[in-house]
Amino acid sequence: VAARPTPPLPTPVPIIDLPQTIPTAAPQADPAARIEIPELGIDLQVVPGDGVNAPYYKAAEYPAPFKLPGQGGRSMIYAHAQKGMFGPLFNGKVGQHVDVTLASGRELHYAIREYYAHWPVDDLRWFQPGDHEQLLLVTCTTYNPNDPRIVAVAEPV
């Protein structure tokens, strides 16, 4: 008995003929790498944060729902209120300059527009999405997590 050749498989045809789209890569994140507030002597490396823990001798970017600095929304960087970190923020003032260097090397320049020395910890208005570029700088006022925070709101210059 001679073997018969296997018939070719049919060419698949789409059930619905949709135009083919080629997925594009999502925009690359360009996180903050360094924050400086020259008038206060603050100069810190910035690392990704979890929104709970602040690393020692570094500042952290708050995760979603916040955007990264330079993305056109509200972003937050936080650090401990100690010497060598955000401790000097106790002397923050409207008009002080904030410089952020992104991982790509791009530099962003802000100025503090609002300063709150005793922001109530249960007032979450700053945790809402912003409608324009803002950089929030946050630190504690004591070791008690229920005590007020220092909040400085900076905007691009």
Task: Please place each PLM-identified region on the residue numbering.
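Solvent-exposed, non-transmembrane regions of membrane-associated and secreted proteins
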Residues: 1-157
